């Protein structure tokens, strides 16, 4: 039994299995990272208990978005501390921030000043940036040849989190905002503490194999099944009013089983590793004396003394490619290394100059695809174009999401949980599809990923017009259409930024770009808050 246990632990720690264990754990953490999507579920109760008006509530929605997206500190620390420490900070901010909101809504403490509520809400939702940064940066480095696919899957599960939290709100919290906030205060940090050990950096594979591609397809397939299960349960809950019922709790249990279904990949890899190890032990040949390597009979004087030739010394001193060197310089170095007799034609000062240039490399700015620091990316037009496109796409989408309850009430819909579920599942499909489709076409047709951001924002115009038309049924269809287009922005922006500016400082660059979300929410929130005063 002890031998089997050691084999299992050795298999799990192996370079092939550990990245998949981390990815599966990251999927559940990404669901936790969607905790800011709970705001529509408790915002009305918060408004009633504290007596806020619509402008004050909309400003709290901005705090919700700022906390969700401003993660520069997490991006700065992701290269200095391990992923588990990043996740630990996220669990702590969730516990403190949502804990105070729970105490306020449950009327356990006296209502604090408005700015305190604003700050603690920002702190609680800021846990999302710590969760996102830890798992996204780690897994994109673990799977560098599948960045679009990995980003789409991870961001897709964040999009699904709204439907997951809605199911918890109906089945476990029994549509009680106080119980839902208690879950965010205690349950969310506890789940993070259980999973944070498994998210760790691993040595990436040299290339993407067909087996790895098949595993990604399996995760995508299970996530689609998971999404349609959530859609079905949301419709059943809405039609038959299953809150406070035994069936709704069964739905929640099945939901958690489907959430954990990708664990089949590391289990399969572990079983294969154990089986192969067992077969190797059985079939391993006995060591033979004739297998011992012998030294060559004839050894040169150079090998015995360990001395290096002048050509070898120059080849080590001179870099293979020096920034800014011309073709003549390359030819001279080549002749020196390949033909030592050519050294006689060089004067001693020229040799010293060549060695000096090799020892001190000339600095230059990074080019597209190389590793940029944030300050280097900030002076690039590509960076600001990507930021503005992301700002427009997610800003208008999050404006609708934050005002979904008010939009539903204005169109005669008392319960907006079904709208939140529809938006969440459509958001997931947009994130998953945007990552997979952009990855396929950038490889096969060399079509830039940003084409899909442009196309989705064009469709977004039609979605906003549908919501404004108030035609019968347009609210549901508009939410679905808007959710898909909204999700595409996330899954396309992430790999685009990594391919333009590299992975070394990706945490900082990613978190700066995501600030387009709260800035967009702040820019677009004034029209609706004036309408729904």
Where is each model-derived feature located?
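Intracellular juxtamembrane helix-capping segments at the cytosolic ends
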Residues: 39-41, 46, 128-153, 165-166, ...
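Extracytoplasmic gate region of multi-pass secondary transporters
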Residues: 39-46, 229-241, 336, 367-369, ...
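Central cavity-lining transmembrane alpha-helices of secondary-active solute carriers
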Residues: 59-79, 96-99, 103, 163, ...
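C-terminal ends and interior cores of transmembrane alpha-helices
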Residues: 92-110, 197, 230, 459-470
